[in-house]
Amino acid sequence: MRGNKNYYFLSLLYFLSLPILHFSSCTHKCGDIQIPFPFGIGEIGCYLDEWYQVECRPSATSGKVFPFLPKINMEVVNISLPGTNDDIFYTYPSFSSIRVKSPVASMGCSTDGNDSGLTLNFTETPFFFGDQNNLVAVGCNNKASLTNVEPTMVGCESTCTTSNNSRSIPFFNKVGCSGSVDSVTRDLLPKNYIPVCSTTKIQDDTLICNGEGCCQAKAPVGSQQLIGVTITNSTNGNLTKGGGCKVAFLTDEVYTLSNATDPEQFFSKGVTVSLGWFIQTKNHSFLQSLDCQNRGELDKGKKRTRQCTCDNHIASGMGYASCACASGYKGNPYVSDDCQDINECTEYKNPCGDTRILYRNTCINTSGGHRCIDYHIPEVMLGLGAGFFVLIVGGGIWWWRKLLRKRRMTNRKRKFFKRNGGLLLQQQLNTTQGRVEKTKLFSSRELEKATDNFNDNRVIGQGGQGTVYKGMLVDGRSVAVKKSNVVDEDKLQEFINEVIILSQINHRHVVKLLGCCLETEVPILVYEFIPNGNLFQHLHEEFDDYTALWGVRMRIAVDISGAFSYLHTAACSPIYHRDIKSTNILLDEKYRAKVSDFGTSRSVSIDHTHWTTVISGTVGYVDPEYYGSSHFTEKSDVYSFGVVLVELITGEKPVITLSETQEITGLADYFRLAMRENRLFEIIDARIRNDCKLEQVIAVANLALRCLKKTGKTRPDMREVSTALERICSAPEDFQVQIQIDEEDETTKLFRGYSGSTEIARSM
């Protein structure tokens, strides 16, 4: 155990000694090129690991030495750290860059042997392509393209035409941003990094390589590590030259018509390509020894406490990092304590602005920055006085504008209140005080506060007529606030009358109208809030809940039929719902049904229709007789309720697609056909089929069949429907009924049980 501790201690001392060795005995320069750590020349310890080892080799022609990276077999042109003035890789502020000499792809040249393609592969290395590189092609009849950049296509075409005014266009130079960024590099990219996807521009468009002898296209960005270059012969028919030397290469240098005329020159001269690099090492102790602050902490708003920052990431035991000196410091972040404070007061010209005596500022250098102090007291006082004056004048203007805006808003609310019939509503509320004392006229401010200014997060329903928001009143009550999209001004009188009528409805299975607001452009209705969704959701969506029981569905049918019977007959004046459907039947926390969205729909509808002239309703629920005559009656509500009964029995939606023929049909027609063919048991919802009271289901099906008769006169009214459902619900378990077939379809009656059991079915 002691031996292991000694080993770890010696290893730590060794890793901490690496930067010291770099300063004391290592060479920092090869020729005219600086070699900053983690790169290094010489013995182990002068560089981080083999990826960063640099050899200083002599040139075979000039005799001068040049730096060389043996691990990737490339000559080094320049190495820069982030934040330095010579950092050409400026679009990666968190990455360092290195420029290396790159080979070229060629065809038809004296030295290539028809090598028409090359591949630059930096996978599994700490190097990747920078975004300053372009694809350049030189030579006649030359079509060059990049490979391994899918799905991006990058290429251009260089031709030599008969006329200097005729220039070819790159055959696909629309460069997209590559999405092939490896996960390690993506984690190290700065969060504010925006890749550059446009092609390279030169101020003088007449000099750019635009296809006449040479062409260029922007290489994709995104930290790619594998790119290939290929050359093919162009098939352009307007050529005077087709042979000769052709070259193509990836480079960060700018080539124009003046310096890219001879393809052969690129073999001797060479080209440079820009690469980004980061730290890739298994030596986690080295990263810890830098004592840099994690850049993620700064992104979260944490105060800077170190002289350097790093983006760190560990994957598969390998440590990855990209470091930089913090703002206000300069140096090498990969050498411990090498980031030194910049004295802005001496290194920058006029860091505090104007240096005239009257406005003299004193610069004081601070760690990572500087401060400017104005010692000219009179000007300070003058500035404070002017500031107070501007503040007072600005405050007065703000208060005056606020007063005008408030007065304008008050006048607007008063106008809306009068136009929306508020005076008439107040008068009628006063005359019926005893019956509608709970109805309230809400102010727009109350409802804005209750719904958080009608915040989209409060939306609980949205449809053609308007949007419903969940709100909370100051007394703690949860309410549903219905804000219509448009109002028909010709029907405002009718709307007010409906509010009076609905305010007098007091039925436990009808959603209570609590009041309205008339101070807005369109009237807003306020209902009690029902928290458990609607029947449609529980029947047709993934709800594994209480409604899967037949007894619960039977109770819902009894409750809502009683509510509609009350609206048709027991209310002070008949109210026809006109849009009965499962989405308008709400369930509270105890699965008690409540009817919503009745009566007022014709007053606040966005389609401006009169209920006796234009068809309105929901597909699958509309009475076919009403559809043909445009005349709505109480029996039209009965038909829609019959569709809801079929939904409760079958669990199907009002419009279905037949599995055999893929034909779209209404649930009512599908149900009538199944009853004619004595297939009721087959279409019963599988969730209730095994534990339901079959005689009750048959009785309800017979009742639904009567409700769905095509002529309104032959349908029962809602009072009969409600009474029949209550009798079915309370009948003994062993009662028997017959399956009753629609006589209009001229089919034979099928029976279940004995003939004496028809009394209940006929009474329905």
From Swiss-Prot:
<feature type="active site" description="Proton acceptor">
    <location>
        <position position="579"/>
    </location>
</feature>
<keyword id="KW-0325">Glycoprotein</keyword>
<feature type="glycosylation site" description="N-linked (GlcNAc...) asparagine">
    <location>
        <position position="283"/>
    </location>
</feature>
<protein>
    <recommendedName>
        <fullName>Putative wall-associated receptor kinase-like 13</fullName>
        <ecNumber>2.7.11.-</ecNumber>
    </recommendedName>
</protein>
<dbReference type="GO" id="GO:0016020">
    <property type="term" value="C:membrane"/>
</dbReference>
<feature type="glycosylation site" description="N-linked (GlcNAc...) asparagine">
    <location>
        <position position="259"/>
    </location>
</feature>
<feature type="glycosylation site" description="N-linked (GlcNAc...) asparagine">
    <location>
        <position position="365"/>
    </location>
</feature>
<keyword id="KW-0723">Serine/threonine-protein kinase</keyword>
<dbReference type="GO" id="GO:0005524">
    <property type="term" value="F:ATP binding"/>
</dbReference>
<dbReference type="GO" id="GO:0106310">
    <property type="term" value="F:protein serine kinase activity"/>
</dbReference>
<keyword id="KW-0812">Transmembrane</keyword>
<keyword id="KW-1133">Transmembrane helix</keyword>
<feature type="topological domain" description="Cytoplasmic">
    <location>
        <begin position="401"/>
        <end position="764"/>
    </location>
</feature>
<feature type="binding site">
    <location>
        <position position="482"/>
    </location>
    <ligand>
        <name>ATP</name>
    </ligand>
</feature>
<dbReference type="InterPro" id="IPR001245">
    <property type="entry name" value="Ser-Thr/Tyr_kinase_cat_dom"/>
</dbReference>
<keyword id="KW-0732">Signal</keyword>
<keyword id="KW-0418">Kinase</keyword>
<dbReference type="InterPro" id="IPR008271">
    <property type="entry name" value="Ser/Thr_kinase_AS"/>
</dbReference>
<feature type="disulfide bond">
    <location>
        <begin position="345"/>
        <end position="363"/>
    </location>
</feature>
<feature type="glycosylation site" description="N-linked (GlcNAc...) asparagine">
    <location>
        <position position="121"/>
    </location>
</feature>
<feature type="modified residue" description="Phosphothreonine">
    <location>
        <position position="618"/>
    </location>
</feature>
<dbReference type="GO" id="GO:0007166">
    <property type="term" value="P:cell surface receptor signaling pathway"/>
</dbReference>
<keyword id="KW-0597">Phosphoprotein</keyword>
<keyword id="KW-1015">Disulfide bond</keyword>
<dbReference type="Pfam" id="PF08488">
    <property type="entry name" value="WAK"/>
</dbReference>
<feature type="signal peptide">
    <location>
        <begin position="1"/>
        <end position="26"/>
    </location>
</feature>
<feature type="region of interest" description="Atypical EGF-like">
    <location>
        <begin position="308"/>
        <end position="372"/>
    </location>
</feature>
<feature type="transmembrane region" description="Helical">
    <location>
        <begin position="380"/>
        <end position="400"/>
    </location>
</feature>
<feature type="topological domain" description="Extracellular">
    <location>
        <begin position="27"/>
        <end position="379"/>
    </location>
</feature>
<feature type="binding site">
    <location>
        <begin position="460"/>
        <end position="468"/>
    </location>
    <ligand>
        <name>ATP</name>
    </ligand>
</feature>
<keyword id="KW-0547">Nucleotide-binding</keyword>
<dbReference type="GO" id="GO:0004674">
    <property type="term" value="F:protein serine/threonine kinase activity"/>
</dbReference>
<dbReference type="InterPro" id="IPR045274">
    <property type="entry name" value="WAK-like"/>
</dbReference>
<feature type="glycosylation site" description="N-linked (GlcNAc...) asparagine">
    <location>
        <position position="78"/>
    </location>
</feature>
<comment type="function">
    <text>Putative serine/threonine-protein kinase that may function as a signaling receptor of extracellular matrix component.</text>
</comment>
<feature type="modified residue" description="Phosphotyrosine">
    <location>
        <position position="527"/>
    </location>
</feature>
<feature type="domain" description="Protein kinase">
    <location>
        <begin position="454"/>
        <end position="728"/>
    </location>
</feature>
<comment type="similarity">
    <text>Belongs to the protein kinase superfamily. Ser/Thr protein kinase family.</text>
</comment>
<feature type="disulfide bond">
    <location>
        <begin position="352"/>
        <end position="372"/>
    </location>
</feature>
<dbReference type="Pfam" id="PF07714">
    <property type="entry name" value="PK_Tyr_Ser-Thr"/>
</dbReference>
<keyword id="KW-0808">Transferase</keyword>
<feature type="disulfide bond">
    <location>
        <begin position="310"/>
        <end position="323"/>
    </location>
</feature>
